[in-house]
Amino acid sequence: MEESQSKQESNTRVAQHGSQQDVDPTFQTKRALEKERSKPRPRPLPRVQLQSLPGWSSTSKDVPLSQLIREMDHESRRCIHRSKKKLDRSEHISQGTIPEIYEKRKETISHTQSMEQKYLFQNFTKLLLLQKCCPGGSEKLVRESWHPCVPEEGGHMIEIQDLFDPNLDTEKKPQLVIIEGAAGIGKSTLARQVKRAWDEGQLYRDRFQHVFFFSCRELAQCKQLSLAELIAQGQEVPTAPTRQILSRPEKLLFILDGIDEPAWVLEDQNPELCVHWSQAQPVHTLLGSLLGKSILPEASLMLTARTTALQKLVPSLGQPHRVEVLGFSEFERKDYFYKYFAKERNTIIDFNLIGSIPVLLTLCEVPWVCWLLCTCLEKQMQQGEVLSLTSQTTTALCLKYLSLTIPGQHLSTQLRTLCSLAAEGICQRRTLFSKSDLCKQGLAEDAIATFLKIGVLQRQPSSLSYSFAHLCLQEFFAAMSYILEDSEEAHGDMGNDRTVETLVERYGRQNLFEAPTVRFLLGLLNTREMREMENIFACKFPWETKLKLLQSIIGEPFCQPCHLGLFHCLYENQEEELLTETMLCFPLTASGPNHMEATVFQTNVKRLVIQTDMELMVVTFCITFSHVRSLRLKGKGQQEYKLTAPAMVLYRWTPISEASWKVLFSNLKCTRNLEELDLSGNPLSYSAVRSLCTALRQPGCRLKTLWLVDCGLTSRCCSFLASMLSAHSRLAELDLRLNDLGDNGVRQLCEGLRNPACNLSILRLDQASLSEQVITELRALETKNPKLFISSTWMSHMTMPTENTDGEESLTSSKQQQQQSGDKHMEPLGTDDDFWGPSGPVSTEVVDRERNLYRVRLPMAGSYHCPSTGLHFVVTRAVTIEIGFCAWSQFLHETPLQHSHMVAGPLFDIKAEHGAVTAVCLPHFVSLQEGKVDSSLFHVAHFQDHGMVLETPARVEPHFAVLENPSFSPMGVLLRMIPAVGHFIPITSITLIYYRLYLEDITFHLYLVPNDCTIRKAIDEEELKFQFVRINKPPPVDALYVGSRYIVSSSKEVEILPKELELCYRSPRESQLFSEIYVGNIGSGINLQLTDKKYMNLIWEALLKPGDLRPALPRMASAPKDAPALLHFVDQHREQLVARVTSVDPLLDKLHGLVLSEEDYETVRAEATNQDKMRKLFRGSRSWSWDCKDHFYQALKETHPHLIMDLLEKSGGVSVRL
């Protein structure tokens, strides 16, 4: 059984596990916390690369993996049950000190109040899921080569609730979903989550009445089963008679986990020969009939299998939904780390122990490896060792696990026997073993007990059988068995040949390098790992065996296709001699016209689809040993240069993590033949640019050309680029176009260009946005250095590849491409509520006005900023983002942080497709200009189901904090308070002025509040209830201080109550402080002022003129009879809208269903001209409510932004907030 550990997504999910194979950290329940507090605390351990809190015990016993898993399943179910109930807040407070989990960059604080369930699927272990887009018309999964979809059909990321969504092409709901992926990646975990979620009523209840889960390796133990017996095995508790269950087959879901594990052939039978559902038949025949739709053709199925096993599974599987599990994102790897060690509540390990080693962090993308690494650290803690892991491969990590787990060399003989058992099981495709199997192999009773205790073996609770803790662990032991056998063989060549024959027979030559056993075997043939094996088994291995076995497995290098499996094997081996010999012998042409291996060779350009950080790491590692001169990591929508052959193009449809960037750039430190690197179209963070420039400064880096077009670079990145240019870098050509460098950034580049050590000869920049002074400076540089050419136009040799009929790459000029695509550079005028991005403004949709929920659909990769909210997103692809306005009081109340931290910005509940957002800028209102606030005091608070997490932002700017590679939950900026400073924190504040006309009298309301969009919106809505309209006036220029008081005064005799305002923070749900000002006659105008009460200096002044008092969009409440009628915006401008709206049909589409019925919609559309349509629409609007007119205004704003802005400006510039 291939099962993996999955960790909880920290923004919205709590891990659920119920399998013998699930490997997940234990979660603390309330009862466990009470029990933990009652324990006495021993003295702390010495601090050696380990941050220990008082109370950590080094005497904790080894817990078998099976026991740990059962405990985790119990705790996970309690977490699910607990999430459905609202805990009593006072009960938590009465328990005393709230336990805390610390790491260097994050702090987790258990809840002191219940967290409401934000959405249905928050309790799931978070795994990255890629739904593949298979070639149209394909009716079989079997292909000449088994590879993810071709580059043009990359697929898209989905969530667990989307597994059975309709196909985008056919709109049909799938009956067959295949969950595929690499070994240990989390396929079985996902399958069990689906079953568990259905049991809990959280998933697919509207589609399936019965869901049955089957472990295929356990089913394979049965000789024969009837359909009725199969259904009975798939239910923990019988829910209905079999006849009743089978009466509605379209409401049934069968989950077959690990269908590729048993050594069976699933053959469909003749439908005419199908037996009755109560009659037994061979299990493989029964399952084959289910898959072939000979029985229950209307039922749905979900299969899990390794990707490489699918082509030989069955002859045909129709057109399934194929979903690939890609493992953990970088954030979830970190989250898993401290969740794992949460079971030792008083122990915390600095995550930098792992995070500072990017290779280790990348390996942890695979959940099983993540568990393995944490287990090694835990064993080191228990044995009192210094915590340190230097493993660069999964093989090395497995050996480390073995050396820490096996108690001494006295078990070496039994360990050999266990390896033989593993190899025999792999060859026979067996993962379950009886007690007699173990004894026949030569395992003693005490050895079996020891292996069970340390967690290498586990006993199956449903039978008397045994298995390895994970299938990957069995494959690792099998690999060791082949090393041990060959070392004992008298005739080494014969032993090598037999080993290779066995592996080819088991996996096939085509998939040989995809098999984990082969990868482990190559890893064990590394010199360092063989020495480690010698220590474990207390023996010596002849080095001749190693070399001959390597040659036997790899074969002739020039006969091997260049694909991911071989790259993985070479990476595991790490031997420079083998890498060089193999990589330099690769052919540069395709082996045939139909050859679509993981790479496609075309005109000396290798193409490779990579989906994960692990794949990117192994490929770039191997490339450095090859003839490849040019490397392109293809970003979406990028324009491209012609690469110098031989070249390789990597296609990647999922986000690249920070750790992966570090590994990639680390591999560039010694590039051998690589001279060109194109990263255009890939968003690069500040830290990624720093890693890149560090690599370019290394003497072994031979890169001469670097393209960074449209990579989201800012002026902050230019300091690294300038330093790199000044450090004797070999770089001769640098392209930085389509980046927001600004004058400051370009000036920093100029400093690097002036350095005599700079070898750059071509620099491409966007100069249109630069000031004349900076452009002059650039021209002066060119004049001073004749070898330097600075350009801002695309060079003639820059081309974009297209496919011709022969499948070869043809080159099209960018000018021709632009002519074909037409003029797409018209930028529509937008408003402050829109998100401004590469293509202009993107409208924000109102999802639920009462709940303050909004949605924006960002159309392409790039950077987007909303002036109204201050939010800023950097996205890698088109994505829909939902934004909710929250109140801190709902989450922060009564936590310890309310005394140690202050709110520093608005709180948002953001939801977005996982991995699509590489950075988010969260606004704050703390003033940094005076240098009185240390930016290290800023934290971003995430409110999650298991508590609140404080994360340190990547950087803090004057108006926002930047969080890179974020996961989303209710989140906002907090500032840690320093006792000596108290509450005297400089604040960026705003003044809000509202007025209402009543006959000739005017009432003003004046607010002084922090610059928080959620507070502003709450005040807008409150004032709107009483027909008050806001006037836009400039805010105070200087920073103000929380707790300070200010005197309100006027240039005329008016009544002001109260006459003092205090600047304070109040949650949006609380009443805000304001002064009410009564004016009998405004005359020519009135001057309002705010003066600091303590120092008597003027901090704000505004002139209110009669022209400011033009009504716009007040909500019509029960106005007095004598009050002037305040018309809605659309009614005020009816004549202009009828005359100037030029595109009515898109407007009607937005109103359809919200305001217009189907009949109204068709009636308006039937009119002949746009003006007649608008008149008809206005005639119907007489019966509309104010909310309907609000929808009308919003639709006009989205379809005709120029017109609406023009009307707003002519009406006096009164702010409109809907």
UniProtKB/Swiss-Prot annotation:
Disordered, as annotated region: 1-61, 799-842
Alphabetic keyword roster: ATP-binding, Cytoplasm, Hydrolase, Immunity, Inflammasome, Inflammatory response, Innate immunity, Leucine-rich repeat, Necrosis, Nucleotide-binding, Nucleus, Protease, Repeat, Ubl conjugation
Site entry (Trigger for autolytic processing), positions: 942
One Pfam family in the UniProt entry: UPA-FIIND
Record-listed E.C. numbers: 3.4.-.-
GO MF entry, a single one: protein domain specific binding
The keyword Ubl conjugation is annotated on this UniProt entry: yes
FIIND domain: residues covered: 835-1118
Comment block on domains: The leucine-rich repeat (LRR) domain may be involved in autoinhibition in the absence of activating signal, possibly through intramolecular interaction with the NACHT domain.
Name of the molecule in the record: NACHT, LRR and PYD domains-containing protein 1 allele 2
UniProt organism field: Rattus norvegicus (Rat)
